[in-house]
Every structure is written in C-alpha cells, then in structure tokens.
A protein has these predicted regions:
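Active-site C-terminal subdomain of aminotransferase-like
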Residues: 129-208
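N-terminal export/assembly segments and adjacent metallocofactor-ligating motifs
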Residues: 1-3
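Conserved PLP-enzyme active-site core in the AAT-like
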Residues: 7-19, 23-165
Length: 208
C-alpha cells in the first residue's frame, strides 16, 4: 500500500520513467483524473524536466506525435463517468508508453479489471472498502503492476516464505530496491505505508 491515490499515481509515473527506453520526456494525463492527482503529478514531475500533457484522451491523444513515457487514465472518471478505455490504452501502447489506470475498487466488482483492459499499472484508493472519509484522510492507496515490473516498484514488498519450523512466514522481499541498500539509486523515497488501513480494507473485502 501507499499513502493515497495521488501519491500512488505519482509513484507509478516514476516507475514508468525508470522503465522507459525511448528517451522521451512526455507524459499524458487525462483531464478526467482527480484535480488533486493531476496537481501532485505535476509537482513530482517538473523537477525532472518531464512535460505533462493534460487533456481529453479522445481529442488530444491522437494529436501527440511523439513517444510517451506513460499515459494516466481514470476508470471511472472523477465525475463518475464510465467509459471503455481499451482504445485509449491501445493508442498509448502504440506510442511506446505504459498505461496507468487509476481505478475505483468498488466499481471493479462489476467493471472489467485493469489487467483485462490491458493496463500496465493499477492504482487507487482503498477508502471505499470500510474506511471512514475522515475529513480527507488518512486513506490507504493500492498499487499493482505486472510481474515483469516488480523490481521497479516503489515502497516495501511483503513476501511469503517458510520459517525454520516449516511454517508460513511473512518477510520483506526485494529489499535491494530500497533506500537502506541502494541509497540515492532506490526506486522510491516512500518510507512508510498505510498498513493498518490496508489491512482494514482487505478484511472488509473478505467479509463482504
């Protein structure tokens, strides 16, 4: 888990930048994303010289001739509109970009999943699963990606292992990505997560 939806989206952009082989500096973000998410991505990308292209995917995306690092889409949009993003995802992939789908967990009980739609990364807030609004937080975010990208993920990853008694044990995995080993070359500076809230959301989902 990560701190909130906007932070998770910005970390996803960072993952895409690490994986990019085209040397482009352009990122597309749909204007149907939450305004706070757009602003936070702007704040995180500007110091790295990245160009953020914000617009309507149906009209604006086709006008972009260059390669993209990634495209950030909302599913559903911030106003609740539900549209099939498959064509947009295909367009971004044709421009050699990864696709980040900001998703609503509860809606995914009925809608196609990001994986089924062809997205590379799925992020969002787990607040809908049993967490009070709390005047804006705290809310845990979720972050999921393809197996092939796991070594570029931000934050800490908990893996399942076996202890010396042969019982299942949970431990930190892939720690060579983190600050205490890679220092300035770490995949992220995220040092914490909303673990308690993530557990509450998981328990809520299991119960229901």
């Amino acid at each position: 888990s990560l701190l909130d939806e906007a932070t998770a989206a910005a970390e996803a952009v960072g993952l895409c930048q690490r994986l990019d082989k085209t040397e482009t500096n352009k990122i597309f973000i749909s204007n149907s994303c939450n305004p706070q998410t757009i602003d936070l991505i702007k704040t995180r990308t500007e110091p790295f010289g990245l160009e953020l292209l914000v617009g309507n995917e149906k009209e604006y995306l086709s006008k972009i001739e260059d390669n993209l690092i990634c495209g950030v889409l909302a599913y559903p949009g911030t106003l609740g509109e539900v549209e099939d993003p498959s064509e947009t995802i295909s367009q971004i992939h044709k421009k050699n970009g990864k696709v980040i789908l900001i998703s609503d967990l509860l809606s995914l009980a009925k809608l196609k999943t990001p994986a089924e739609l062809g997205a590379d990364i799925a992020v969002g807030s787990s607040q809908r699963f049993g967490i009070p609004m709390g005047y804006g937080g705290p809310h845990a975010a979720f972050f999921a990606t393809k197996e092939e990208f796991k070594r570029s993920m931000p934050g800490r990853i908990i893996g399942v292992s076996v202890d010396r008694h042969g019982k299942k044990a949970y431990r930190l995995s892939l720690q060579t990505r983190e600050q205490h080993i890679r220092r300035d070359k770490a995949t992220s500076n995220i040092c914490t997560a909303q673990a308690l809230l993530a557990i509450i959301s998981a328990a809520y989902a299991i119960y229901h």
